[in-house]
């Protein structure tokens, strides 16, 4: 509902004022100009992640359709849905964090993946963080997961007790020997590879992030069926879970996709470059500057109706 209000001032510029006298017309022009400049100024405001933590319920959509806004690392979502705590082949963990909300496409994807995992004879799939009720930036843990199109799936498998699932911090399964920079063969098994493969085969998936050592292991054991490997991308960390990212829905004009993944299976020189030591004289990376949030995301936090979804 607030989405229409956020855009109303733009539409208002084109209202026919021919029947209004000059003084009233001038006052309206001044008022509209003030609103526009206020809106443009607010584009430079960077909201605190704490503001998004206060959003406790999904932001209702005026037309009933979910709307991911912005990018995976700078965005929000209107009309998110909660993933049920348990379903066929899956269980949500760390529910105390209130990060089990996502775009309907993500909710359906996770339910679908749980069913496929169960049909393949895999243990219960454990689903970690998706997004907060309104998406947005996190105080801790994630740079992305902001539009409800990212989800973490643990490499520990098997159903947990309800008490463990509610607060399962420290109960993950590390499958990489961090010192040796390779998969720990004592804990890695074919179930891990099968679950990642099933996750990547879904056409709605654009990327899956895993530790570089896990990608190497998958490249070594994939056999001839390698059509899914290109979606599996090496990234820092991700040694006790993998991170699924879905493409922007076709009916989401405010959602910004990433560039397509490169061609090939991703098992060549680029992968092994992750294990090379830094080159001498390599420049130190500059501190990242946090960009302003998309204007519509700012409007969520400033909406007159915000009491409906705040704590």
Predicted regions and their residues:
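Active-site acidic/histidine clusters and adjacent loop/turn architecture
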Residues: 56-128, 188-197, 202-205
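Bacterial N-terminal signal peptides that target proteins for export
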Residues: 25-34
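Catalytic cores and adjacent binding grooves of peptidoglycan-active enzymes
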Residues: 48-51, 167-311
């Amino acid at each position: 509902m607030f989405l229409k209000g956020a855009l109303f001032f733009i539409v208002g510029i084109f209202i026919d004022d021919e029947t209004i006298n000059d003084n009233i017309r001038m006052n309206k022009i001044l008022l509209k100009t003030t609103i526009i400049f206020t809106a443009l100024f607010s584009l430079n405001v960077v909201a605190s992640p704490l503001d998004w933590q206060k959003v406790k319920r999904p932001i209702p959509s005026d037309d009933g359709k979910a709307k991911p806004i912005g990018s995976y690392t700078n965005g929000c979502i209107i009309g998110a849905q909660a993933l049920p705590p348990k379903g066929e082949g899956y269980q949500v963990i760390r529910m105390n964090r209130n990060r089990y909300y996502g775009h309907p496409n993500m909710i359906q994807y996770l339910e679908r993946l749980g069913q496929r995992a169960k049909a393949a004879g895999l243990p219960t799939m454990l689903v970690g963080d998706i997004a907060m009720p309104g998406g947005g930036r996190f105080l801790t843990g994630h740079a992305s997961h902001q539009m409800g199109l990212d989800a973490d799936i643990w490499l520990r498998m098997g159903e947990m007790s309800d008490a463990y699932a509610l607060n399962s911090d420290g109960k993950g399964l590390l499958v990489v020997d961090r010192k040796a920079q390779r998969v720990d063969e004592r804990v890695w098994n074919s179930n891990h590879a099968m679950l990642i493969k099933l996750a990547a085969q879904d056409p709605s998936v654009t990327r899956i992030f895993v530790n570089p050592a896990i990608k190497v292991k998958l490249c070594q054991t994939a056999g001839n069926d390698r059509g899914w490997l290109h979606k599996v991308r090496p990234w820092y960390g991700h040694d006790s879970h993998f991170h699924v990212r879905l493409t922007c829905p076709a009916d989401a004009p405010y959602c910004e996709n990433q560039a397509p993944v490169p061609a090939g299976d991703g098992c060549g020189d680029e992968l092994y470059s992750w294990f090379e030591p830094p080159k001498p004289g390599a420049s130190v990376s500059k501190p990242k500057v946090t960009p302003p949030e998309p204007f519509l995301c700012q409007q969520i936090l400033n909406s007159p109706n915000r009491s409906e979804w705040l704590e």
